[in-house]
Amino acid sequence: MAERFDVIVVGAGMAGNAAAYTLAKGGLKVLQIERGETPGSKNVQGAILYADAIEKIIPDFRDDAPLERHLIEQRVWVMDDASYGYHYRSEDFNKPPYNRYTIIRVHFDQWFNKKAREAGVLTICETRHDLLIEGGKVVGVRTDRQGGEVRADAVILADGVNSRLAVKAGFSRDQPENWALAVKEIHFLPQETMEARFNIGEEEAAIEMAGKIDAGMMGTGFLYTNKESITLGVGCMLSDFKQQKISPYELLDRMKTHPSIAPLIAGSDMKEYAAHLIPEGGYNAIPQVYGDGWMIAGDAPIRHGIHREGSNLAMTTGMLAAQTLVELRAADKPFSAANLAEYKKKLDDSFVMKDLKKYRRMPEIFHKNKQFFTTYPDLLSRAAQTLIRVDGVDKKTKEKEIKKSFIGLRSLFGLIGDAFKFWRAVE
């Protein structure tokens, strides 16, 4: 006879661990299945942890979580052959409790999963699986382990952007047109060297990059400082990589030679490389997130690319999915599609869907208007150089030169049209 659980959680990333932990704390019997060797071994992220999301799940997470540095400074670079940028630094973010941290995913995910196991979750890794569906209802999973079938009243799918189980079962579909591919490297440096280069103490700086760094494709680069390492990466739309005939590795190598980046990683020891698909379709690309005996959480349905958020959305969706099941079990209600619709209501009432809905037009606008990643970074960089250079030319003349260069690269009607498109995207 197949072993039975209240809930099976597929995946041991941010969403999967959040769901499993919340379920166990709610008194449910939980099995968590992970394909990788260990929790975190297949998980890749820019590695920023947002405290608000994890705090709702584990309030005292700061006591023992493997946190690298807390973030107090955000820099944005608009890149051409040189670079132009701005930064925001606030000492308010340097006062505990800190709001954002850099993390190493493999370390954090293992810690998070340990918390779930301590709460009562049974986690098994290196396990392949398929959904068990009977009469249109998900009733468990079939694994490649001895015993095969494992039954449950509900299954939460938190197995990533291209959720193999959801697609195979027909709950979702592959959407490569809405996927970005991010690649990153971890560069190790002595702590004192890093702190001197970035002018930081125990706190951290994050840098986001756009422009020539992405070869005119829809995407961004990023650099985050950890305790003794730098996370450096770039992500662009999968379709753009194909169209431009450039590999992610080539783009990352080009990024490392940029004069603004090369000095920051000089002398470092690159020990880790990873790649990851990221959903960038936004609100309009969200699939059905629940059905009879199943729910989807994490990267599979949701990510907020505009504000570079991911971990907080993943954890929140996992938590809300779990809370829905805990509440239904407490009310002695079945995990039917009609009852699991409460999960979608919780999502709609949360910041997750509200933010995604607000920016629902932006992915399509950016994808169809590449000038936001080519022409405008060049224009902004030229304008900054013109204004900053002291060469005996009066400011009024310089302003005329800037206006002329703008209209030279983009017509007046084009500028007005782009401004309207951008306004429509963020209104």
UniProtKB/Swiss-Prot annotation:
Disulfide bonds: none
InterPro entries: ETF-QO/FixC_UQ-bd, FAD/NAD-bd_sf, FAD/NAD-binding_dom, FixC-like
Keyword Oxidoreductase recorded: yes
Swiss-Prot/TrEMBL GO biological process terms: nitrogen fixation
Gene3D superfamilies reported in the protein's UniProt record: FAD/NAD(P)-binding domain
Record keywords, A-Z: FAD, Flavoprotein, Nitrogen fixation, Oxidoreductase
Cofactor(s) needed: FAD
Keyword Ribonucleoprotein among record annotations: no
Single annotated GO MF: oxidoreductase activity
Domain of life: Bacteria
Any one Pfam family match given in the protein's UniProt record, by short name: Pyr_redox_2
Family listed: Belongs to the ETF-QO/FixC family.
Function: Could be required for the formation of a functional nitrogenase Fe protein. Probably accepts electrons from FixA/FixB and reduces a quinone.
Name of the protein in its database record: Protein FixC
